[in-house]
Regions:
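Beta-propeller blade signature
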Residues: 24-42, 88-99, 144-154, 163
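Generic long, charged, amphipathic alpha-helical segments
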Residues: 84-135
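Short beta-strand elements that form the blades of beta-propeller/WD-repeat-like
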Residues: 9-14, 70-82, 129-137, 181-183
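Extended repeat-based solenoid scaffolds, especially LRR ectodomains
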Residues: 13-15, 21-71, 76
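Short, small-residue-biased leader/transition segments that mark boundaries at the very start
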Residues: 1-4
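Sequence/structural signature of beta-propeller domains
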Residues: 10-14, 20-28, 83-86, 140-143
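Conserved blade-ending motifs and adjacent loop-strand segments that build the rim/top face
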Residues: 49-61, 102-122, 155-173
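C-terminal structured "cap/appendage" subdomains that terminate the fold
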Residues: 119-164
Length: 183
């Protein structure tokens, strides 16, 4: 098919050098954004680190999965060398995968974020026309909230902040689905 006409497949992955340190309870390695390129004509595969900032749980606008995507989103990680637990950071990253630039969205003092989830504007074909949603845990008051961020103005204040009546545990993952997808 059409994919073979492209000759080079490019993948962006959140990769760490090893999954664990000394054992499965050692989280001293944190992941970073890498670019893998697979040349279909020559069979060669290359790897390049895109950024030194630790991040994980990468996402794109789900309407662009498996297609060329300009924008990718990662949750920041902190605690490099922490052998006891991976530390979710207080930021999200928006990468322009075409030019390598990265914008940051600060989630607040004393907070830890979660996996970013993309919600596109219904009916829009523009990749960056939508919202990035993130569960945020406040370590100070042990409460959680859902932040909704304009993908096209990523570093700006959230367009909405929804306080939740309980603390969402770390490691929660999710997806955005429309009413039509539920039917």
């Amino acid at each position: 098919g059409d994919v073979y006409k492209r000759q080079v497949i490019t993948l962006f992955v959140s990769k760490q050098d090893s999954a664990f340190g000394a054992d499965s309870g050692d989280f001293s390695e944190v992941s970073r954004l890498h670019r893998w390129q697979i040349n279909l004509a020559t069979g060669q595969v290359s790897e390049e680190k895109v950024d030194d900032r630790p991040g994980d749980f990468g996402r794109v606008n789900d309407n662009f999965v498996g297609q060329p995507s300009q924008f990718g989103y990662l949750m920041a990680l902190e605690g490099e060398g922490n052998s006891e637990e991976p530390v979710y950071g207080p930021k999200l990253y928006q990468y322009d995968l075409y030019n390598g630039q990265c914008k940051e969205h600060f989630l607040g003092d004393g907070t830890r974020g979660a996996e970013p989830v993309y919600a596109p504007v219904p009916g829009s074909d523009a990749e960056n026309d939508g919202w990035v949603m993130c569960l945020v845990h406040n370590e100070t008051n042990n409460k959680s909230k859902l932040l909704i961020i304009d993908a096209d103005d990523f570093s700006a204040a959230p367009v909405a902040s929804i306080e939740l009546p309980y603390a969402v545990p770390y490691g929660a993952h999710g997806n955005w689905i429309t009413d039509q997808q539920l039917r």
